[in-house]
Amino acid sequence: MAIDVVALRSRFPSLAHGFAFFDGPGGTQTPAPVAEAIARTMTGPLSNRGTVSVSERNAERTVAEFRAAYADLLGVPASGVVHGRSATQLTYDFSRHLAKTWRAGDEIVLSRLDHDANVRPWIQAAQRAGVAVRWIEIDPATAGLDLDSYERALSPRTRLVAVTAASNVLGSLPPVRLIADRAHEVGALVHVDGVHYAAHRLVDVPALGADLFVCSPYKFLGPHCGVLAGSPDLLGTLAPDKLVPSADTVPERFEFGTLPYEVLAGATAAVDFLAAMDPDGEEGHDGADAAGPAGLRESAGQGVPGVSRRERLRRSLRSLHAHETALRARTEDGLRALGDAVTVHSKAPERTPTLLMTLEGRDAREAQAHLAARGVVAPAGSFYAHEVFAALKLPDPSLRVGLAPYNDAEDVDRLLDGLSSFLRTAV
């Protein structure tokens, strides 16, 4: 069954303003149940975590529900789920934690395909520790990773391989499991940036071979925060700098200060919203907890009796993949019809519905402004993909078009019409 996009779109208040949003890779729009979960948490009885008062128990439950939701989303134990302000902050934190175990003469391997948040923290940690940095290069022909360069970069001295699961500008999906297996053969840990990947694919951290995996709920309908998933055993070997009275258990030892309970509640609601997009999951459901015309359930833990949240997520993301793939094909067909004036740099065989393009002889920021005047939001820039732009010699800015669950065919047609009219304007 296909996702009911009309019903789905009705759950996003911002869409009522008439905009067509193609900036999902930078952050998605927020569905009402997520905003409502945040508001309920902030306006209900709430204290620091504890077990005595109702307000303390509310905070404790909010944290437990958050960890359970992201355990289901990422395929990991709840005790391996760490909250952070952002994926960038978490990567910086864990670069410092891991670098304590490095020694001069060690090496790490990074990827040119990555967002700078999975590059700069490791380079800076390596510089402080006297560790050498090796690179997996980009294959210009495929916009994917050159695995021969990876083989050359690996050595018995490699301590860490950091790689993206999906490029945030090109959409390319590198073979993470293959990369991880080779890293493990030489005794290295693998840190995977899944920020873009988690918005478009069901994540299975163990199946990817990742020792550490980061993602950002605001890229898949949630609030602004970051999540790290890791093996509790591995996390137990890491010793962050922390306050003496603060918890030394895993994963709490990595979370500094009072947690933002309202953000955790919103992040949990985002996972439940994703799980409820599955049309097949409505079978046998009595509808008693349906919310609005979409039948999308608002409350944590509600779902089809006998069907786990992980299974509902699998079904939903399978349907979402089909929906976004069809829209990507419609977009690509329309861009080809515009002729040689548009060059699409996203060309890997396996990729997300994210397209990076340049317009012959035109400034991408002018195109962005032209589209914005027509209610179409498509940003121009380099999107923190510093190594990608340098390796492929891409113009900065370039135009990025990213699809999200709430996009529909009318959005795509508005985008294509806007680009066509821009290309017809005088230079």
PLM ranges: what are they?
Residues M1-V427:
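Pyridoxal 5′-phosphate
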